[in-house]
Swiss-Prot record:
Family to which this protein belongs: Belongs to the GST superfamily. Tau family.
Protein name: Glutathione S-transferase U13
Keyword line: Cytoplasm, Detoxification, Phosphoprotein, Stress response, Transferase
Role description: In vitro, possesses glutathione S-transferase activity toward 1-chloro-2,4-dinitrobenzene (CDNB) and benzyl isothiocyanate (BITC). May be involved in the conjugation of reduced glutathione to a wide number of exogenous and endogenous hydrophobic electrophiles and have a detoxification role against certain herbicides.
Length: 227
């Protein structure tokens, strides 16, 4: 597959998973056409259904005649298909395996905890779900402190694979903080993640694509019919 083949990205402005793909493409300076699915939960384009017939979700990267789906898979593909500097995944084999492990932890455990908070039916269920999400974030705080080695990002001095993976949590956490009144990123428990989130949001590869907290909360209120 030639690097200069046509590149398109099917995404949705509100999707934290689409953000992962857009940040990766920006870091690699890949020129692409962005095809937005404004409300992908209600209506999906024929191109999306054709390009990702199994999961029918964004993002989907179209590279020439190829389609690549699932956000972490897209990020890895972008890193390998455009091997120019900067590298998104670590060069060291152990560091690379570790980054993939924690990225999967985020998608499997942390998002499950987010969903549990949102779907809690009573106060007891909500308290249990909140505790689980707090636990996940405490583990990510510890991971950040070890991975960053005192620098600004999980990847060190620059945004890397685990930064991109973790970024998908920021929007959903902002929404459930607004809805539940519970603060999940706290100075006393996650000081590193708080500073990291500020740096990540302000980065030139992120800022053009990441919705503000206000935009995400407003979208969620409209979606769930919450005043």
């Amino acid at each position: 597959m030639a690097q200069n083949d046509t590149v398109k990205l099917i995404g949705s402005w509100s999707s934290p998973y689409s953000l992962r793909a857009r940040v990766a493409l920006h870091l690699k300076s890949v020129k692409y056409e962005y095809l937005d699915e404004p409300d992908v939960l209600k209506e999906k384009s024929e191109l999306l259904l054709k390009s990702n017939p199994i999961h029918k979700k964004v993002p989907v990267l179209l590279h020439g005649d190829l389609s690549i789906s699932e956000s972490l898979n897209v990020v890895q593909y972008v890193d390998e298909a455009w091997p120019s500097v900067p590298s998104i995944l670590p060069s060291d084999a152990y560091d690379r395996a570790s980054a993939r492990f924690w990225a999967q932890y985020i998608d499997d455990k942390c998002f499950a905890a987010v969903d549990a908070v949102v779907g809690a039916k009573d106060d007891e269920g909500k308290m249990a779900a909140v505790g689980k999400l707090m636990e996940c974030l405490a583990i990510l705080e510890e991971t950040f402190q070890k991975s960053s080695k005192g620098l600004g990002f999980f990847g060190g001095e620059t945004i890397g694979y685990l930064d991109i993976a973790c970024s998908a949590l920021l929007g959903p956490i902002s929404v459930i903080e607004a809805f539940s009144g519970v603060k999940f990123l706290r100075q006393e428990t996650t000081p590193g993640l708080i500073k990291w989130a500020e740096r990540f949001r302000a980065h030139e590869a992120v800022k053009p694509y990441m919705p503000t907290v206000e935009e995400v909360v407003a979208f969620a209120k409209q979606k769930f019919n919450v005043q």
